[in-house]
Every structure is written in structure tokens, then in C-alpha cells.
Amino acid sequence: MGDYRYTCEGSHMKAPIGARVSIRFHDPEGGFRDLVGYLESENSLRNRHGELIEFDVEKIAIYKVIEEKIHSAGHGAPLSIRIQELERILTATWPPLRQEFFGKWLIRTSGKFTMRANSVLPSGKAPYGEPSQDIDSSIAHVITHYEKEGLAPIFAIPLPTYADLDSKLFEQGWIEKVRAHVMVADIAEHVFGQSKFKTLISDNFDESWLALQEDHGVAELMRGYPALYASVFDGEKLIGVGRTAHAEGWSALSRVFVDPQYRGQGVSKLIVNALLQSSLEAGIKKSVLQVDSKNLTAINLYTSLGFDFHHEYVYRSYQKTLQILSEGCC
């Protein structure tokens, strides 16, 4: 539960995107109706079931911003609930071009760029989540959907919640493509030491930012949600980049990349610290990121910055070949 910190009347909400709100609307037939959830835009919110609901701001009678009770990152609720919360945040801050619910499974479609934006995220009760049909029919529906899109069918399976689903897909021949750690941290003040490199934070990116790691393919996805972008320079040369986006009180880090010639010089740490400090200044107290489970160098870096392992997920593909850009999460 949260605390109601202030109440406002009228149709012009000042609540920030990502805030949890309770909104009361005038009902055309008389009386009122209420919605509670996290704001995703000026006229939409996502409720506790993960459903996106649009509303008419002109019909708002009153609204309240609910300030959540603060728990340490990765604590405060059963693991299965925390996993679903974090996966919801990671989807919100890296939104697919199209998404639709199949029961409580979320089917995400975005062309050929990134597995997260082109995969099914199960949700609901274990062992398989809660699709709208029996499990075998639901898997067949997923295959049909992505094959019609010209894409490899992929599941993004949070573990251990849906370990039985992972096993079932494995038995049916689905191939493991990537296994990733989800790591979390409480954000603390960051004291920046002397550095010969210059760090800038912006609310947008430019051609040079995209070009550093050939990120042109994900530009449209990144524009789909407000974010902060870090750039590190050696003189006039761009040598490192990173991104964070805020949702539900979390800072979701992604796209951290350093020019190979500058690796081992603390540039990654500069990027992450700058993004976390900017998040803290925006009132964000917790951070989450994804990293390939095989990337021990990055895992050690994030551990040194206070991140702890929370859970892992696996991408399983129905085909042995996959024409989708790999998830670049760190």
C-alpha cells in the first residue's frame, strides 16, 4: 500500500509519467468511477493486472498521487511478485512498437530489432502464466503470430517463476538463445573523482550516439519512452554511451557501451554513475539492469557499483536461426 500525498482537482494532472495515481472520473450516466495504476502517458495508465487503459482527461473529477512505501531494491514482496514488477518496468522503459495481451501473456512485436521487443512475456500464476487458452494451443498461437510477422517465435521466460514453461519449451525443441541476469541496486549519492573524460547527460540522442554502437535499428524503440542519455567524451571524440528510463520509482539502465579502444579505463563506471546520479536527482531511489549471464566483466563492474543479482531470464526461440538484433543491455 502507499500513502496519498496530495490531492488535486480538475482535468490538468501534474503527476509525472510513471507515478502511481488514483483517478476519479465523472460518469456520463451520473456518479463517478475510479482507476488506479501507473501513468504511462497523459491519458493512459497500466493497472495492477498489466492492462493499459486509456482515459479522457476532460472527465477527471479529482486525482491523487500515491507515494509508494520505499523498500530496498529487490525486497518487500514475494519473489514472484517482484519478478513480475521488474519485468513490467523493463517492458515499459523499452516499449515494443506493438503489444497485445493473450490472456496474461504479453505478445510484443517490433520488426527485427531486439528480442525483448519481439518476444512473449508470460505473466500470471505459475507454472505457465495465464494465457487465454490451454498451454499447447497457446504455444501454437505464439508460433503462428510471429511466423505471420516473418519473425522467429521467442519467449522471454523469467526464472524461477516459469521454470516449468522453460522446460516444456526445451522438450519441444525451442533453442536457448540468451540467458541474462537481472540486477538491482539502491541508488546512493555518487562522488565523482577526477577524470580526463567529460560526461554529459541529455534527454535525447543524436546520430553520433547511435553510431558508436551501431544502434540505428533501435532508435524508434528508444524514442518510445522518455529517457536520459549519457555521453562520455575524450576531447571531442565520443567514447561511451548509456541510457536510463524511469518507471514506477525505478531507473532502468540499458545500452551501456564503450569504444573498444577505451575499455579498462573506467569509462563504463563513469556512464553508470552519471545515469544513477541523474536518476537520484529526479527522485528515483532504485535501479535495475539486464546483463548477459556470460559477461562476467560487466557483472563484476555492476557488483562493484552496488548491484545484486535478483533473478534471471532466458530467451527461447522456436527456430535454430534468428534474424533479430541481440539485446544490448549493458
Residue ranges and their predicted role:
Residues 2-102, 106-111:
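Conserved RNA-binding domains used in RNP assembly and mRNA/RNA metabolism
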Residues 2-11, 15-17, 60, 68-79, ...:
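Short amphipathic alpha-helix that is part of the acyltransferase structural core
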Residues 94-98, 106, 134-207, 316-318:
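Acyl-donor-binding surface of acyltransferase catalytic domains
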Residues 134-143, 255-258, 264-281, 300-304:
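Conserved acetyl-CoA-binding loop-helix of GNAT-fold acetyltransferases
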Residues 149-158, 279-290:
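Conserved GNAT acetyl-CoA-binding A-motif
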Residues 156-163, 260, 289-299, 315-322:
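Conserved beta-strand-loop-alpha-helix junction that forms the acyl-donor binding cleft
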Residues 160-176, 269, 293-312:
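Conserved active-site alpha-helix within GNAT-family acetyltransferase domains
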Residues 219-260:
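A conserved beta-strand-loop-helix scaffold within acyl/acetyltransferase catalytic domains
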